[in-house]
Every structure is written in C-alpha cells, then in structure tokens.
Curated annotation (Swiss-Prot):
It comes from Escherichia fergusonii (strain ATCC 35469 / DSM 13698 / CCUG 18766 / IAM 14443 / JCM 21226 / LMG 7866 / NBRC 102419 / NCTC 12128 / CDC 0568-73). It catalyses: Zn(2+)(in) = Zn(2+)(out). PANTHER family: ZINC TRANSPORTER ZUPT, ZINC/IRON TRANSPORTER. InterPro entries: ZIP (IPR003689), Zn_transptr_ZupT (IPR023498). The lineage of its organism: Bacteria, Pseudomonadati, Pseudomonadota, Gammaproteobacteria, Enterobacterales. Belongs to the ZIP transporter (TC 2.A.5) family. ZupT subfamily. Mediates zinc uptake. May also transport other divalent cations. It is a multi-pass membrane protein. Its main location: membrane. Keywords: Cell inner membrane, Cell membrane, Ion transport, Iron, Membrane, Metal-binding, Transmembrane, Transmembrane helix, Transport, Zinc, Zinc transport. The chain crosses the membrane at residues 5-25, 32-52, 61-81, 109-129, 137-157, 182-202, 203-223, 236-256. This is Zinc transporter ZupT.
C-alpha cells in the first residue's frame, strides 16, 4: 500500500477519534474545537497558496493559463457543489436544545452524515493527490483534514448516542463520513495511479489547491466562529500557518522537503 493512500486512510479515520470522545464522555470544549478548525484552515491555506499552486505552475509544460485556470475551476467547483449538496453541518446537531426522539435524531443524523460525506469526498482526493506529488505537503494536508474530522465525528456521534444509548450506532454513523474521504483517496489511487504525465498531475494539484482554499474560507473558518462566537478563529488560522510554515522550513533545511 502506498504512503499517500495510508495518509488518506489515517486522515479519514480521525473521525473515529471524535466519535469515541463522544461516547466516552470526554468532549473537548467549544474553544478547543474552534481553534482546531482555524488551525486546520491555516495549514490548508498556507500549503495551497504557498506550496501547491507554485509547485504546479513550476512544472515543465504547465502554462500559467492552465495552472490558474485549474485553480479557479477548483474554487468554483467547490462552491458549486457546496450550494447543490445538502447543507448540513456538525453544529446542526451540536446546537439542539431539546432532546429529540431517537427516530427524529436518526433521520437528522442520516441527512447530516450524507451532507458531510459528500463534502468530505474531495478531501480524500486532495490528501492523496498532494501526498503523491509531495509527501511533505501531503502530511500537512492529512493533519489538517484529521483535525477537521475530529469535531465532525464528535458532533455526529454525541447526539446519536444520547438519543439511542448505543455506542455502536453512534460510532457507525460518525464513521460513515470518514469513510467517504477514504473512498475518495482509494478512487484517486485507482484512477490517477495510471497517469504518469507530470502536467496532468500538476493540473490536478492546482485544482485541489483551489478546493482547499474554498474549503478553508467557506467551511472551516465560519464553522469555527459558529462553534465559539466569543473568540476570533483568526488566531487558530495564524497559528496553523505559522506552525506549518516553520515545519516546512525545518524539513527543507534538513533536506527532507
């Protein structure tokens, strides 16, 4: 099994961490969850704009028109899908003030899981594509995706467990959304594994960079603000950028990057 695929599997499996935290009663504070989402957004923004897009444009045979065009396609494609898909978020369950009936919350969990899964599918592709092109950047994306998945698993599993009393059911529904990312990575492995053209890989990477920027701005940062309205998610974003930037410098200085 390839290292990029393993990173994708680990990132998707992070959903189970949130699910287990929910059923074990060790729920992190909203402040921690919001900071982790901002941190993840910072990692994605820095890698996408400072590493992935420039690396794609630097590939021999890649024209600026194609590179920036694919980046814009990634941006617009994400926003288009985001408007078309069921727009359910983890806070839809986290903010419930009344105890719903198990049947009602089960239906809500299904819709929420469907929405999250459809949104998470491109993240699996992004993790695999990035790691295939540059393992160092792929590790950063995998970390950001994993941080994003923990609150999602927590938000889905917690209310389901409270309503049904079944840890297995709660973990099951939370795990489905993580499996969507794993599926995305597997499909990318099967499809892109046979494409050897550097230009094709660079074009895909530019589009993925656009997707990650849109995800950070449209999903992670607003969600962080909703979970913890009293704190500015920009602090998490700046910390994520700083930590990722320093780690890239260290790795490149050591000759790893």
């Amino acid at each position: 099994m390839s290292v990029p695929l393993i990173l994708t599997l680990l990132a998707g499996a992070a959903t189970f961490i949130g699910a287990f935290l929910a059923v074990l009663g060790q729920k992190p504070s909203n402040r921690v969850l919001a900071f982790s989402l901002g941190f993840a957004a910072g990692i994605m923004l820095l890698i996408s704009l400072m590493e992935m897009l420039p690396a794609a444009l630097a590939v021999e045979g890649m024209s600026p028109v194609l590179g920036y065009g694919m980046f814009i396609i990634g941006l617009l494609g994400y926003f288009g899908l985001d408007r078309m898909l069921p727009h359910a978020h983890p806070q839809d369950l986290m903010q419930k003030t009344q105890q719903p009936l198990p049947k009602s919350i089960r239906r809500t969990a299904i819709l929420l899981t469907l929405g999250i899964s459809l949104h998470n599918f491109p993240e699996g592709i992004a993790t695999f594509v990035t790691a295939s092109s540059n393992l160092e950047l792929g590790m950063g994306i995998a970390l950001a995706v994993a941080l994003h998945n923990i609150p999602e698993g927590l938000a889905v599993a917690g209310p389901v467990y409270a309503a049904t009393g079944s840890k297995r059911t709660a973990i099951f529904w939370a795990g489905i959304s993580g499996m969507a990312e794993i599926l995305g990575g597997v499909l990318a492995w099967l499809i892109l594994g046979s494409l050897i053209s550097p230009v094709v890989m660079a074009a895909v990477m530019a589009a993925v960079a656009g997707i990650m920027v849109a995800l950070s701005v449209d999903e992670l940062m607003p969600l962080a603000k909703e979970i913890d309205p009293n704190n500015n998610p920009s602090y998490g974003v700046l910390c994520g950028m700083s930590v990722m930037g320093l780690s890239l410098v260290v790795l490149q200085t050591a000759g790893i990057g």
